[in-house]
């Protein structure tokens, strides 16, 4: 007898990047920063009050949210902090996609999107890129939710934020713009996310690529 949910029994899990242990190998497969942290990071850690670790941290990350809000000219109430982008993607899928619903994304892209759809007992709907690897405009009713990776990974092609803004206005679901590589691009969609008229668009950032 299996106690596992029926829709999970066939699931093939997300395969993480290989972690080689051979001497002299240059590791590039998981897009990690090849440089060490700033010396200021070491100074901040050395000055950290270790006694505070015996208590739970602020569950709503107030200070971090206030700082991020000040950087982007928005309210702290518009900022959500997660334990990595994967957690935020998981919460996004569970919050905005019903069981049996659909989540759209371009293909090729980050393979976790489809895995999270299956975990939710939803259907992932890949939308193929154009022959030049640019992102085509998805239909406005393509899915219940859509993840637009910009710049795209793995192609690195960037879509003009104005095009994404136009899609968000016509799209009938919730749009998440995954900007994991935004720090390497000349423009981003943050102004779209913090705009007062925005009702269906979220922008996700990470510290794992450029920091």
What are the language-model segments listed below?
Residues 1-55, 142:
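N-terminal "arm"/small-domain region of PLP-dependent enzymes with the aminotransferase-like
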Residues 75, 120-121, 171, 197:
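Short, structured coil segments at secondary-structure junctions
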Residues 31-34, 85-86, 110, 150-154, ...:
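Short glycine-rich anion-binding loops that position phosphate/pyrophosphate groups of nucleotides
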Residues 95-149, 154:
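PLP-dependent aminotransferase-like
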Residues 132-142, 154-210:
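Active-site pre-lysine segment of PLP-dependent enzymes
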Residues 62-102, 120:
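Phosphate-binding glycine-rich loop
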Residues 43-47, 70, 94, 98, ...:
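Short, well-ordered alpha-helices that flank and scaffold nucleotide-derived cofactor binding pockets
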